[in-house]
Protein backbone atom coordinates (compact mmCIF):
# COMPACT_ATOMS: atom_id res chain seq x y z
CA UNK A 1 0.00 0.00 0.00
CA UNK A 2 1.60 3.33 -1.04
CA UNK A 3 1.86 6.38 1.19
CA UNK A 4 -0.70 8.95 -0.05
CA UNK A 5 1.79 11.80 0.47
CA UNK A 6 4.94 10.55 -1.22
CA UNK A 7 3.81 7.41 -3.06
CA UNK A 8 6.42 5.14 -1.43
CA UNK A 9 5.35 1.82 0.06
CA UNK A 10 4.38 2.01 3.73
CA UNK A 11 7.05 -0.01 5.55
CA UNK A 12 8.46 0.26 9.07
CA UNK A 13 11.67 1.59 7.52
CA UNK A 14 9.91 4.32 5.54
CA UNK A 15 7.72 5.17 8.53
CA UNK A 16 10.79 5.55 10.77
CA UNK A 17 12.45 7.74 8.17
CA UNK A 18 9.30 9.86 7.82
CA UNK A 19 8.99 10.39 11.56
CA UNK A 20 12.69 11.26 11.88
CA UNK A 21 12.58 13.60 8.88
CA UNK A 22 9.66 15.49 10.41
CA UNK A 23 11.54 15.72 13.70
CA UNK A 24 14.61 17.06 11.86
CA UNK A 25 12.52 19.82 10.35
CA UNK A 26 10.97 20.62 13.74
CA UNK A 27 14.38 20.82 15.44
CA UNK A 28 15.73 22.94 12.60
CA UNK A 29 12.85 25.39 13.17
CA UNK A 30 13.53 25.31 16.90
CA UNK A 31 17.21 26.15 16.35
CA UNK A 32 16.25 29.04 14.04
CA UNK A 33 13.92 30.46 16.71
CA UNK A 34 16.62 30.11 19.38
CA UNK A 35 19.14 31.86 17.11
CA UNK A 36 16.69 34.74 16.61
CA UNK A 37 16.24 35.00 20.38
CA UNK A 38 20.00 35.14 20.95
CA UNK A 39 20.47 37.68 18.15
CA UNK A 40 17.84 39.94 19.70
CA UNK A 41 18.83 39.48 23.36
CA UNK A 42 19.96 43.12 23.56
CA UNK A 43 17.32 44.66 21.24
CA UNK A 44 15.48 47.36 23.13
CA UNK A 45 12.79 49.72 21.94
CA UNK A 46 14.05 52.82 20.15
CA UNK A 47 11.57 55.21 21.76
CA UNK A 48 10.38 55.74 25.31
CA UNK A 49 7.41 53.56 26.15
CA UNK A 50 8.14 51.05 23.39
CA UNK A 51 8.57 47.35 24.03
CA UNK A 52 11.84 45.49 23.51
CA UNK A 53 12.16 42.22 21.64
CA UNK A 54 10.03 39.49 23.20
CA UNK A 55 11.43 35.95 23.34
CA UNK A 56 9.73 33.51 20.98
CA UNK A 57 8.98 29.88 21.83
CA UNK A 58 8.13 27.03 19.47
CA UNK A 59 4.99 24.95 19.99
CA UNK A 60 5.08 21.44 18.57
CA UNK A 61 2.16 19.21 17.71
CA UNK A 62 1.91 15.46 17.20
CA UNK A 63 1.10 14.24 13.70
CA UNK A 64 0.36 10.84 12.22
CA UNK A 65 3.03 9.37 9.95
CA UNK A 66 1.76 6.05 8.58
CA UNK A 67 0.33 5.04 11.94
CA UNK A 68 3.30 6.32 13.95
CA UNK A 69 3.42 9.56 15.89
CA UNK A 70 5.63 12.29 14.47
CA UNK A 71 5.99 15.97 15.26
CA UNK A 72 5.49 19.25 13.45
CA UNK A 73 5.99 22.90 14.42
CA UNK A 74 2.44 24.13 15.05
CA UNK A 75 3.18 27.77 15.88
CA UNK A 76 5.62 30.23 17.37
CA UNK A 77 4.36 32.04 20.46
CA UNK A 78 5.75 35.07 22.24
CA UNK A 79 7.01 34.32 25.76
CA UNK A 80 4.80 36.29 28.15
CA UNK A 81 7.35 36.42 30.98
CA UNK A 82 8.13 39.96 32.14
CA UNK A 83 10.84 42.07 30.56
CA UNK A 84 13.99 42.80 32.53
CA UNK A 85 14.22 46.40 33.74
CA UNK A 86 17.46 48.35 33.96
CA UNK A 87 18.21 51.88 35.13
CA UNK A 88 19.72 53.84 32.22
CA UNK A 89 18.30 57.38 32.07
CA UNK A 90 20.42 58.25 29.00
CA UNK A 91 18.88 55.49 26.85
CA UNK A 92 16.39 56.69 24.20
CA UNK A 93 13.84 54.11 25.39
CA UNK A 94 14.08 55.12 29.07
CA UNK A 95 10.80 55.99 30.75
CA UNK A 96 10.26 59.11 32.87
CA UNK A 97 11.95 57.41 35.86
CA UNK A 98 15.01 56.46 33.77
CA UNK A 99 14.27 52.74 33.45
CA UNK A 100 14.62 50.79 30.23
CA UNK A 101 12.82 47.54 29.48
CA UNK A 102 15.19 44.84 28.23
CA UNK A 103 14.24 41.68 26.32
CA UNK A 104 13.04 38.69 28.33
CA UNK A 105 15.78 36.57 26.74
CA UNK A 106 18.24 34.72 28.97
CA UNK A 107 21.16 33.77 26.73
CA UNK A 108 22.22 30.96 29.08
CA UNK A 109 18.77 29.34 28.77
CA UNK A 110 18.90 29.83 25.00
CA UNK A 111 22.34 28.20 24.83
CA UNK A 112 21.07 25.19 26.79
CA UNK A 113 17.98 24.97 24.57
CA UNK A 114 20.20 25.15 21.48
CA UNK A 115 22.36 22.30 22.71
CA UNK A 116 19.27 20.21 23.45
CA UNK A 117 17.88 20.92 19.96
CA UNK A 118 21.24 20.02 18.39
CA UNK A 119 21.30 16.69 20.22
CA UNK A 120 17.73 15.92 19.18
CA UNK A 121 18.64 16.79 15.59
CA UNK A 122 21.68 14.50 15.71
CA UNK A 123 19.60 11.68 17.22
CA UNK A 124 17.09 11.93 14.39
CA UNK A 125 19.88 11.94 11.82
CA UNK A 126 21.08 8.69 13.39
CA UNK A 127 17.57 7.23 13.08
CA UNK A 128 17.52 8.07 9.37
CA UNK A 129 20.99 6.63 8.86
CA UNK A 130 20.06 3.44 10.72
CA UNK A 131 16.81 3.10 8.76
CA UNK A 132 18.68 3.54 5.48
CA UNK A 133 21.05 0.75 6.46
CA UNK A 134 18.24 -1.66 7.30
CA UNK A 135 17.51 -4.28 4.71
CA UNK A 136 14.20 -3.86 2.93
CA UNK A 137 11.74 -6.72 3.51
Give each language-model segment a name:
Residues 1-137:
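Amphipathic alpha-helical polymerization modules
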Amino acid sequence: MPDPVNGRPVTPRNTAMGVAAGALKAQQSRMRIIAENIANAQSTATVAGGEPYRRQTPVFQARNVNGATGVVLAEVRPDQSPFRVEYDPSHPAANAEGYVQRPNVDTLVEAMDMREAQRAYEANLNVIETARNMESP
